[in-house]
Amino acid sequence: MKYTFLAVLSAVTVLATPAPVPTPPNIPSASTAQSLLSGLTVRPQGPQDGYSRDKFPHWITISGTCNTRETVLRRDGTNVQVDGSCAATSGSWFSPYDGATWTAASDVDIDHVVPLSNAWKSGAASWTTSQRQSFANDLSNPQLIAVTDNVNQAKGDQGPESWKPPLQSYWCTYSRMWIKVKSVYDLSVTSAEKSALTSMLNTC
């Protein structure tokens, strides 16, 4: 099958044909996600006071010389080659948020699906540093995913009530990931956040 190139922006190529979508682990079905959402505590966000990314130690060593970022790059990429320090030297990465494919690891961010700041304001402020480190480096749940860097930066610490992936076709998966993480870590949701997640689940 021939690929039709729609655009070339710097190192990115957007493909007309579907690319394999990376699948972080432990994404629930839509029906399970709906049940999990119903079980989440609904309350206003807590204060930002005291928050710092440093309170969520991230990109820790996972295996050998590979840290969390490098591990996710290898998991979510295709034909990824690394050097002796585990830095990706070649490969390609499809970003399911916007449908772009990148060939330089420097153009890819590892997104915390539930942002650290959001977690802080919905329960993580009371956690120990060890608990926050586990959250920030969680490879067992759908909390980390490789995506286009500027899309991740546009998301910032926003919840689904104010930011959704540009590709509407990914809203179903994104909402299921978000809900799973909130459920695993017993984090609260706001009423607007719950409403947005419900609407996104309705696209499944």
Curated annotation (Swiss-Prot):
What is the name attached to this protein's record?
Uncharacterized secreted protein ARB_06907
The residues the entry assigns to the signal sequence are 1-16
Q: Which organism is it from?
A: Arthroderma benhamiae (strain ATCC MYA-4681 / CBS 112371) (Trichophyton mentagrophytes)
Extract the coiled-coil ranges from the record. Answer: none
Q: Which Pfam families match?
A: GmrSD_C
InterPro entries associated with the record: GmrSD_C
Q: Name one GO cellular component term.
A: extracellular region
- What PANTHER family does this protein map onto? AMP-DEPENDENT SYNTHETASE_LIGASE DOMAIN-CONTAINING PROTEIN-RELATED, SECRETED PROTEIN
Keyword list, A-Z: Secreted, Signal
Signal listed as a keyword: yes
Annotated compartments:
Secreted
